[in-house]
């Protein structure tokens, strides 16, 4: 059953990643690897930074084990109060952070980018103001999707990427002539709205209702925040690397930061299709096995997951490294995407490919530590 679910999620993720490549192809064809795309990718890294930090990363992995234990200890009705408190706290926090991003967009970009060209900086500044509230919608989506996965409603949660990519693709094509790169920013924001909206029907099937409760004294809320601290430190360490990479890239000739992004999309394809699909399906099974103290199931699931991952990732790594230039040419070289952009992007992709197996394995191993409430090793890694 676990690997049947994994296969379904992999198929959906494969479709999502293919659409992701189509999205990048369209962005590359319409805008190329230029100062304008550097501004767009730099602006969207800021809400993405906070989203990974508080939404997709720490909250999802901390929230589900506590939720499952709460149901075992006190029943679903009591544990639902915990869910409502978490979601309402997210709304308050992310709304505040999004407003701060808008108010202090210039100061943030001066820290995270190295734009010397005033035009690129001003474009990034306006784009950051447009996409800031993406953080609110996608952080909520991160918790809601974790809840759906826990109830084995994998297909809807896995389809978030499809909605994201379709929104960007359609938005770019519809708005490119009237709004240029700013149309891309608007499509990016709308994708967050649509991802959350898509999951709400199944969320209400599980929860039945919604309560605007803030219970900061809830024992499960307190425990969640305590467990989040080391997780946040670990994720922050990784995310800050991306911000630093982008800062250095924006100090180089126009288009360098965009080439870095285009290469990372190809590198993230096998991670998204294989590593994340397996991790998403395995995590609820591990969490429930730990609650019932079934260590035999935990060992079996982790071992099977690692073997399956290696079988899928090693060939992917070899292909990406050996055929980097051909792949980049096939996918990106059209419209405004030049031969110079192909060379920079393919060389970057080869370096990414070397670390593919190791980075993919982290997705599985960190979750196996999280279910035991072990945050130390993931933070160190």
Model-identified regions with their sequence ranges:
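Membrane-embedded alpha-helical bundles of multi-pass transporters/translocases
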Residues: 1-381
């Amino acid at each position: 059953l676990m690997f049947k679910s994994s296969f379904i999620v992999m198929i959906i993720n494969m479709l999502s990643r293919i659409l992701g490549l189509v999205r990048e192809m369209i962005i590359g064809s319409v805008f190329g690897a230029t100062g304008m795309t550097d501004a767009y990718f730099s602006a969207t890294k800021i809400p993405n930074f906070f989203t990974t930090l508080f939404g997709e990363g720490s909250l999802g992995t901390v929230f589900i084990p506590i939720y499952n234990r709460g149901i075992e200890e006190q029943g679903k009705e009591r544990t639902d109060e915990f869910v409502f408190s978490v979601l309402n706290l997210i709304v308050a926090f992310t709304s505040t952070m999004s407003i701060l991003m808008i108010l202090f967009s210039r100061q943030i970009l001066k820290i995270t980018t190295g734009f010397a060209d005033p035009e690129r900086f001003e474009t990034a500044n306006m784009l950051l103001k447009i996409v800031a509230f993406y953080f609110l919608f996608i952080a909520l989506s991160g918790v809601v999707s974790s809840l759906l996965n826990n109830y084995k409603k994998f297909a809807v949660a896995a389809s978030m990427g499809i909605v994201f990519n379709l929104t960007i693709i359609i938005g770019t094509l519809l708005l490119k002539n009237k709004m240029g790169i700013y149309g891309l920013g608007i499509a990016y924001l709308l994708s967050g709205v649509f991802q959350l909206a898509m999951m709400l029907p199944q969320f209400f099937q599980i929860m039945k209702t919604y309560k605007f409760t803030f219970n900061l004294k809830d024992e499960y809320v307190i425990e969640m925040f305590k467990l989040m601290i080391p997780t946040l430190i670990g994720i922050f360490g990784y995310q800050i690397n991306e911000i630093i990479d982008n800062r250095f890239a924006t100090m180089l000739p126009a288009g360098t930061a965009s080439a870095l992004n285009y290469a990372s999309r190809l590198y993230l394809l096998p991670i998204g299709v294989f590593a994340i699909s397996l991790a998403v399906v395995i995590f609820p099974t591990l969490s429930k096995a730990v609650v019932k103290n079934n260590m035999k199931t935990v060992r079996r699931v982790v071992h099977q997951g690692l073997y399956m991952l290696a079988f899928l990732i090693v060939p992917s790594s070899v292909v990406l490294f050996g055929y980097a230039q051909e792949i980049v040419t096939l996918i990106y070289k059209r419209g405004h995407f030049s031969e110079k952009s192909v060379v920079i992007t393919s060389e970057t992709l080869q370096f990414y490919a070397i670390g593919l197996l190791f980075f993919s394995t982290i997705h599985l191993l960190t979750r196996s530590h999280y279910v035991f409430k072990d945050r130390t090793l993931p933070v160190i890694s």
